[in-house]
Amino acid sequence: MKHYVLVHGGCHGAWCWYKVKPVLEASGHRVTVVDLTASGVNMSKVEEIQTLADYAKPLLEVLESFGSEDKVILVAHSLGGISVGLAADMFPSKISVAVFITSFMPDTTNPHLFMFSKSFVGALWSLRHMGHMIVL
């Protein structure tokens, strides 16, 4: 049995894995889905996010709660790859593999936020404003 942790992309929530989760569970795997900060049912406000660690906090807390012998398969979609990159840096011993599905993916030379080093504030601004335009 493997343990999957599924991380959604921008402007989504854990709900986006609703078809994948039962298929993995039916195959005997354990599955954890996470709502990142201000996403899905997480009630935080997007204006409270100041750093990547703030945004990824629910994922980091989930990984921190697992025992030292637990190793998970971390799956990221889209913008979730940035949070997964941070989690892989912080908890390398708890991750057996990271899977990036049409996702931002860290390289092996530069820090995980290299691509956003000068524009992270701009990226957050875009997310804040896109979030106001999205009607579900």
Swiss-Prot record:
Disulphide bridges, residue numbers: none
Keywords: Hydrolase
InterPro entries in the record: AB_hydrolase_1 (IPR000073), AB_hydrolase_fold (IPR029058), MES/HNL (IPR045889)
A Pfam family recorded for this sequence: Abhydrolase_6
Keyword Cytoplasm attached: no
GO biological process: embryo development ending in seed dormancy
Ranges where the AB hydrolase-1 domain occurs: 5-108
GO molecular function: hydrolase activity
Family listed: Belongs to the AB hydrolase superfamily. Methylesterase family.
PANTHER family with a match to the protein in the record: METHYLESTERASE 9, METHYLESTERASE FAMILY MEMBER
Protein name per its UniProtKB record: Putative inactive methylesterase 20
Organism per entry: Arabidopsis thaliana (Mouse-ear cress)
